[in-house]
Amino acid sequence: MNRFRVSKFRHTEARPPRRESWISDIRAGTAPSCRNHIKSSCSLIAFNSDRPGVLGIVPLQGQGEDKRRVAHLGCHSDLVTDLDFSPFDDFLLATGSADRTVKLWRLPGPGQALPSAPGVVLGPEDLPVEVLQFHPTSDGILVSAAGTTVKVWDAAKQQPLTELAAHGDLVQSAVWSRDGALVGTACKDKQLRIFDPRTKPRASQSTQAHENSRDSRLAWMGTWEHLVSTGFNQMREREVKLWDTRFFSSALASLTLDTSLGCLVPLLDPDSGLLVLAGKGERQLYCYEVVPQQPALSPVTQCVLESVLRGAALVPRQALAVMSCEVLRVLQLSDTAIVPIGYHVPRKAVEFHEDLFPDTAGCVPATDPHSWWAGDNQQVQKVSLNPACRPHPSFTSCLVPPAEPLPDTAQPAVMETPVGDADASEGFSSPPSSLTSPSTPSSLGPSLSSTSGIGTSPSLRSLQSLLGPSSKFRHAQGTVLHRDSHITNLKGLNLTTPGESDGFCANKLRVAVPLLSSGGQVAVLELRKPGRLPDTALPTLQNGAAVTDLAWDPFDPHRLAVAGEDARIRLWRVPAEGLEEVLTTPETVLTGHTEKICSLRFHPLAANVLASSSYDLTVRIWDLQAGADRLKLQGHQDQIFSLAWSPDGQQLATVCKDGRVRVYRPRSGPEPLQEGPGPKGGRGARIVWVCDGRCLLVSGFDSQSERQLLLYEAEALAGGPLAVLGLDVAPSTLLPSYDPDTGLVLLTGKGDTRVFLYELLPESPFFLECNSFTSPDPHKGLVLLPKTECDVREVELMRCLRLRQSSLEPVAFRLPRVRKEFFQDDVFPDTAVIWEPVLSAEAWLQGANGQPWLLSLQPPDMSPVSQAPREAPARRAPSSAQYLEEKSDQQKKEELLNAMVAKLGNREDPLPQDSFEGVDEDEWD
């Protein structure tokens, strides 16, 4: 063979399309795994959305000028780590997740409803599923990797055929050879292994692949002898290696690229030998031709991307535009779009070029799982890509049979988002579905429900049966109020307050914000005096020690409690007219803790009662009038992340770094009354009582650093959470702000740009998602204001303060209503008077209980909408079509002629030429 042969792909060029051809306005998610995050069949594209456990589904080909619509499929209760389409059935999708299961889904055709439940569930595994792939020759076999374990599954029986020998560390890649006989794995222990799963579970061959243990990936060539690996060398440089399984001790060829941190995703077309390398977080694609005969990795072309790459996938060869010499098509997943990038070989003649498009594997499996396991090595019959030889035989897998169509009168439509028509207005974003389905942890049983991605249907009853309940607050919109109400020119803010603190606090009169200057200074801003602050220094409270948390007394708007790193709590009295000078002497200093204080919480009903948690692992209950701690709670084994009083003030709940949630009755004893499992992650957590004190909501992290919500029954903590809802992956703890009147909770973290909004229910489905609020720049915190600050005339459900880098702005959450002239009593029940105490500290400590007064928010000049007179339905005039249907063709013709004659009329007006003046007779000469 000529060593210096000329490649037929040497002139291959990448052709990014125009923006009109993009699948735009999607919301792709970022995941910590090094998988593709997008896959394609000949009909559909599936990709990770920005909601954990939810995939976006979109057609591969558009229909004329109609925009492609994205449907959302709720697959798992946790992050989807990997996905794969069947090589034989375009509508059979497998998904693996951090919830430790593998699920198989039958996706519908255009205009049909997405499934509400998987057809097959494999697992659960002991660890999150990291890798999965369908078998290339047999329908119903797939390989999956979870932790150090690799299993080969018979999906029809929902049982593993074999479990390969344990690896030395986390398995990063597991792929089938093209003939389906071997499995290759790449592991974090730097070893590349080859298995023959039908012969023995141990590796038949192994070698050191890459010198660095960072992410490594594998891809087989068209034959079983050769495969390609990507990874990092000892110098942290990215490299690609070509291997021959017959000479496995060293690589045939290697290629070193650069020192970028993004892992390389190898997209290898085994028929052409073209390899596209996609680096996550980068803006460039590299294309090489893999030539095992030389051996060599020959560069072909490079493509500069317009946006950052989050994932990539190859389109199957049967879907390529072969008449335009498209030899590859890469789907680039970015944050907001899917960009199809075609690789074309320039040719003069517009015809089918057999040298570029050899026969490829068809879509009919060669064997069944039982025969394959018994040793059958039949290969999939090849088909020609020549359009003149099509269509080819099709195949529908029996693993998940297609669903029977519903009757026309109740057939649902897919919950779709028109791509390119998304609302671009700033302020809020609509959820893919009004129902967010949480999961029950695996120790408690199967998932309670699944987000179906189903949307509107002709019948409201069928909609409710398909979607389940939806929140009446789902259309609430967050809006930043006019700039006249902002406080601007804030300088020197302390943005590094401990994670246990909200960062600032507010009541209806003023805001307290810690400053970065030494001495633990706290600025007090008057909400009644908005505008630009002076450039000069503000009068402050000189705390004397760095501030760890602060809280306003709910019954005295002029008293502020400030906790310091010196284990002391200082109570400050702010003058009624505001802070006009620097205060250095607090009203009271509370001492008792031996370590730095974490959190402060005032009692909701009793005056002068304050709870504090500390790094000394205790919670102390203070009598502020006496200036001493009266109760001390124990039992924590690690740092206390958060504490919260129950609405009736009788119980206190805590969440701790030791992974436990505890409930105390402080007046009954120092030990916890109940104890249950909390979030697994140790990065931070928050706890709040919800649903009239029947439930506890905990926000925290799982073991994969994903932010999640856990809902507990307050009387049964030991049984674990009722439901768990995963949100996203971010470093900051979600801070919950709960409105007991509506059952709505606002959730956001320091440094976030999005505020989640959910309605909480004490029974399934527990979480109902509403519109979230988004902003172009991150905020430093969010604090909910009292209910009396809401403008009920504008149906304002909640008002909060948003702290930015240099300003403080109010945000109102309003519900669109048509008849605003009436008081919306269905969303504004009587609210508790939380600014007046019910008990004294001494009475509460002696065992007394009470209930807060209730106050109506209805203005005196408004009547409730429940008593509004019903509007009579407008009478619709019969359409002309109804009259025409009752007339014969002859009558229609006569009426048409009469109408034309009547329009023209019998006009006797003089003609234009009658008004012309002629010439004299003698002028004719």
Curated annotation (Swiss-Prot):
InterPro entries: Coronin, DUF1899, G-protein_beta_WD-40_rep, WD40/YVTN_repeat-like_dom_sf, WD40_repeat_CS, WD40_repeat_dom_sf, WD40_rpt. The modification Phosphoserine is found at residues 462, 465, 915. Residues 429-460, 866-882 have a biased composition (Low complexity). Widely expressed. Expressed in the spleen, peripheral leukocytes, testes, brain, thymus and small intestine. There is a cross-link at residues 472, 680 (Glycyl lysine isopeptide (Lys-Gly) (interchain with G-Cter in ubiquitin)). WD repeats lie at residues 75-115, 124-163, 166-205, 209-253, 542-582, 592-632, 635-674, 728-768. One of its GO terms (molecular function) is actin binding. This is Coronin-7. It is found in: Golgi apparatus membrane; Golgi apparatus, trans-Golgi network; Cytoplasmic vesicle; Cytoplasm, Cytosol. The membrane-associated form is phosphorylated on tyrosine residues. Ubiquitinated via 'Lys-33'-linked ubiquitin chains by the BCR(KLHL20) E3 ubiquitin ligase complex: 'Lys-33'-linked ubiquitination promotes interaction with EPS15 and facilitates actin polymerization at the trans-Golgi network, thereby facilitating post-Golgi trafficking. Deubiquitinated by ZRANB1/TRABID. PROSITE patterns: WD_REPEATS_1, WD_REPEATS_2, WD_REPEATS_REGION. Interacts with clathrin adapter AP1 complex. This interaction takes place at Golgi membranes and not AP1-positive endosomal membranes. Interacts (when ubiquitinated at Lys-472) with EPS15. Keywords: Actin-binding, Cytoplasm, Cytoplasmic vesicle, Golgi apparatus, Isopeptide bond, Membrane, Phosphoprotein, Protein transport, Repeat, Transport, Ubl conjugation, WD repeat. Residues 419-461, 858-925 are annotated as: Disordered. It comes from the Eukaryota. The gene is CORO7. Residues 884-896 have a biased composition (Basic and acidic residues). Changing residue 680 to R: Does not affect ability to regulate the anterograde Golgi to endosome transport. It comes from Homo sapiens. The keyword Isomerase does not apply. SUPFAM superfamilies: Putative isomerase YbhE, WD40 repeat-like. SMART domains: DUF1899, DUF1900, WD40. The keyword Transit peptide does not apply. One of its GO terms (biological process) is positive regulation of hippo signaling. One of its GO terms (cellular component) is cytoplasmic vesicle. Belongs to the WD repeat coronin family.
